[in-house]
From Swiss-Prot:
Keywords: Membrane, Transmembrane, Transmembrane helix, Transport. It comes from Schizosaccharomyces pombe (strain 972 / ATCC 24843) (Fission yeast). The keyword Transmembrane applies. This is Uncharacterized transporter C11D3.06. Its main location: membrane. It comes from the Eukaryota. GO terms for molecular function: antiporter activity; transmembrane transporter activity; xenobiotic transmembrane transporter activity. The keyword RNA-binding does not apply.
Length: 455
């Protein structure tokens, strides 16, 4: 039992600061929306909608594209190729900056896209202006996330949280200064938040340089321009893997808006809650991915297999705790957000459905992490597309407009996450770990090194 307990301890201890970090990262936007909301309800709507659009597009480059580093970076670290990790970081900066360029165009010309999505011309116009001011800061978000992955790969999991504990309150102050004190209004919010992202990145570089993490950096190297292929491929597949789930939830939000004011308000409460809770399986998934990829790169397939199994058990346990808690507070939870009795009642009605998929969502997080650790982002993307877009979304939308309303939409989401969780669990448990270790080592090592490690 010693080895499994060691893995349980490792996952829990190292995922905790990662989860905290993502919660703080989300708070940068949340606090910006709250500060902007003091201008009025229309400004609140614009800020909330623009950040939602940013999350569904630009932030996918950061949170989906950097999954390539989870795989390749941890393989290198496991194989003891520390200096190669710094070169991979340089490759990541170049690749993700290039991938961010189309996002800049989408944000700059977002008005027709938003009108196509049936948003009002006024909201589309104001959101486009907001997003244009967010473009410079968005690259800071991408760079910060990539540098965090560079440190997490070296098992330095707390650095990002330390930095965000500093920049989160500064972000509130910056938003207040630019939005209200200097009178920039809606323009001030994206500028302030963008400054916070760049400040977070700069402070994290100083942490890596002067505190911990510099041993894997040996200066800029022209080799970072070589062999873009694996990083580009895994980045794009990671974006699709993460994006297909996020887009499905955004589609649910758009459909909920057509069901009326009360369902839309209840959906806003539920989505805000789910986004916060999702940081838990997402954080567990990152540590699982790093651990699995590390063992595969080190030629320890049995350890990688054990980590995946332990991660599945931890995911089920964590999901169960969240599920029980949500069911217990369902009748009073809506009061945190509103005094409207109809909204509170609808939140209480839908909460058991949201609670029902917490175990599946936790499995999705941990098993998705295991898949990324083996470099199989493509498999995760296919599973997500099949579950959400071929089954769950069509069913949920049909039920929503045939008497079930918001409950129908969330029935679809429960089915989707159940399919994803079960399929990914089966795929990971059926993995040929020796074969995956061979692939991991062969990405960066020669055949003699491969034979020596696996023997």
């Amino acid at each position: 039992m010693g080895r499994p307990l060691t893995e349980v301890k490792y996952l829990l201890i190292n995922s905790a600061p990662v989860i905290l970090g993502y919660a703080l990262q989300n708070s940068l936007q949340t606090s910006s929306v709250i500060v902007t909301g003091r201008l009025g309800p229309s400004e609140l709507s614009v800020a909330a909608f623009a950040y939602m659009f940013a999350m569904s597009t630009g932030w996918l480059i950061a949170l989906g594209g950097t999954t390539a580093f989870d795989t390749l970076g941890s393989n290198l670290w496991g194989a003891g190729k520390k200096q190669e990790l710094g070169i991979l970081l340089q490759t990541g900066f170049i690749v993700l900056s290039i991938l961010y360029l189309p996002i800049c165009l989408v944000w700059w010309y977002s008005k027709p896209i938003l009108i196509f999505l049936h948003q009002t011309p006024e909201l589309a116009e104001a959101s486009q202006k907001f997003l244009r001011y967010l473009i410079p800061g968005g690259l800071g978000y991408v760079c910060f996330e990539l540098l965090k992955k560079f440190l997490q790969t070296q098992e330095i999991t707390r650095a990002g949280s330390y930095i965000l504990l500093v920049t989160s309150p500064l972000n509130v102050a910056l938003n207040f200064l630019l939005v209200h004190y200097y009178g920039l209004g809606l323009k001030g919010a994206p500028l302030a938040t963008g400054l916070s992202y760049w400040l977070s990145f700069i402070l994290l570089t100083q942490y890596a340089k002067y505190v911990k993490g510099a041993e894997a950096w040996n200066g800029w190297n022209k080799r970072c321009l070589e062999n873009f292929g694996p990083f580009v491929k895994l980045s794009l597949l990671g974006i699709v893997m993460v994006g297909t789930e996020w887009w499905a939830f955004e589609i649910v939000a758009l459909v909920a808006g057509k069901l009326g004011a009360v369902p839309l308000a209840a959906q806003s409460v539920i989505m805000t809650t789910d986004q916060l809770l999702n940081t838990i399986p997402f954080g567990l998934g990152i540590i699982t991915s790093n651990r699995v990829a590390y063992y595969l790169g080190a030629g320890l397939p049995d350890n990688a297999s054990l980590t995946a199994k332990v991660a599945a058990i931890v995911g089920v346990a964590v999901g169960s705790v969240i599920m029980i808690t949500m069911i217990a507070v369902r009748n009073i939870y809506g009061r945190i957000f509103t005094n409207d009795p109809d909204v509170i009642q609808l939140v209480a009605l839908v909460m058991p459905l949201v609670a029902a998929f917490q175990i599946s969502d936790s499995l999705n997080g941990t098993m998705g992490g295991a898949l990324r650790g083996t470099g199989r982002q493509k498999v995760g993307a296919i599973v997500n597309i099949t579950a959400y877009y071929l089954f769950a979304l069509p069913l949920g939308i049909y039920l929503a407009f045939h008497g079930k309303g918001l409950v129908g939409l969330w029935i679809g989401q429960v089915i989707a996450l159940s399919i994803v969780g079960i399929l990914e669990l089966k795929i990971v448990m059926a993995t040929d770990w020796i074969s995956q270790s061979r692939k991991a080592i062969s990405r960066f090592g020669d055949s003699s090194e491969l034979t020596a490690l696996l023997n």
